[in-house]
Amino acid sequence: MIKDLENEIYKSRKNLNNILVLFDYIDLSNHSIDEVNDAAAALCRVYCYLSRNGLLKRPKEDDSSANAQVKNWVCDNYINYTEKLTEIFSMANVEALQVSFLTMTMRLCKAESQMDENGTFRNQFYIRFCLELLSSSQLSDICIKDFVTSYLVPYDDVRFFFYKNSKKVISSLIESSKTDDPMANLDIVAFNTIRILSAIPSPLPSSSTSSWADEPSPSSTETSSIKRAFQESWLSALSLPLSVNLYKQVLNVIHKRVIPFLQKPNLLMDFLTDAYNSHHAVSLLALNGLFTLMISHNLDYPLFYPKLYALLDRNLLYLKTRSRFFRLLDLFLSSTHLPATLIASFIKRLARLALTAPPGAIAIVIPFIYNCLQRHPTCMQMLHRSSAESGDSFDFDQPDPLLTGAIESSLWELSTLQNHYYSNIASLASIMSQKFTKPRYELEDFLDHGYATMCDAELRRPLKNEPPIEFEKRTLASGLEKSWI
């Protein structure tokens, strides 16, 4: 039935009213998903056919001919059809339809571009699609994945205009929210925009990318235009209210997928410093981006090391993200130009925290301190000083790492760890009592240790001697006549 209605349209313009019949099929309340999909696909093919025949171009306003009336009728119904297409992205439990309708949407965008004299990408329908996509609370993960992998990554013009459109959509919705418009759900827009932006590896064209339209748009291939659109899109997204999870998602990619492609990376300074001063887990993730701005883009942030020092608390050594933190901390303290008093405070605080840390965390702290002492020999005096000489001058509660008095204190904590209940930790800590001739530890070898890996290592360890047992083993062959049981 649907196929017959479609074929009749190709045969004669007299059958254009079949468009209305097909349109009625796109109704999930009265038809099955398969019928809705088939009817929508048929109309997509019909409108692509009509665009090639010039029926999707509006006639001049003063043209009242029969042909002009047909064109206006076709264009009006085309708008209704595209609205029906985009509505599906706001419906629940229709993941398969969302992917299918995405394909139809992009085909129509291509057909519209072919109507243009230059053959470049036309944005009229695409921007309405972007508005619906970013505003949807029912957008499926599989639809986003298909949009990113099938269109945004391989096609420069689709990606470029998405950057432009997302900025326009966000600006429009922010203005709407000022008038208490209930439709302007900024949380949803932030969630969808960042999900999509974070999934794009690079905004710049590569040898494997091309244009979705027949001819590439000049602006979509110019590096300066791309970076400007990319920057405006990201800054608009970051101006929206972000949940802790969204903060984490952004901060996980910002140093690799955002900062290198911005025209003015310093514009992220406020965002990163706010993140660094916020929730503990967010602060840890903000380290990399903030440090990148400091090293590569001359950001002046004098409170970086005091704030970094404040992150060293008892909770840190129990977090899942401690491995990432120690990778970054090793990078931040690697410069030999840092003051010895600063390095000494970090060493001493970590040593103190190790006293109450789990074995997996201690296995990171000891090699980390060893490497720091080798890199900063001035701090070796802490290792050789006896705590009985003048007591421990270290002020654990002092927030400024330059004023803790750690450089005048003793690392008695490392001596204590040499008597740890877990023999492997005690053996590892004993390296501090030996000459510092051993090369620096590869920190990566210690970052993933935990109770599970330690138990597994113990269970796999071969026994040198059979352990003695209290009771004599008995077998059925030994008989029961002498048994006391």
UniProtKB/Swiss-Prot annotation:
Regions crossing the membrane: 284-304, 328-348, 353-373
Location(s) in or outside the cell: Membrane
GO cellular component: membrane; Noc4p-Nop14p complex; nucleolus; small-subunit processome
Top-rank taxon: Eukaryota
InterPro entries from the UniProt entry: CCAAT-binding_factor (IPR005612), Noc4 (IPR027193)
Protein name: Uncharacterized protein C1604.06c
Membrane topology per record: Multi-pass membrane protein
GO terms of biological process kind: rRNA processing
Keywords, comma-separated and alphabetical: Membrane, Transmembrane, Transmembrane helix
Family membership noted in the UniProt record: Belongs to the CBF/MAK21 family.
Lineage start: Eukaryota, Fungi, Dikarya, Ascomycota, Taphrinomycotina
Listed Pfam families: CBF
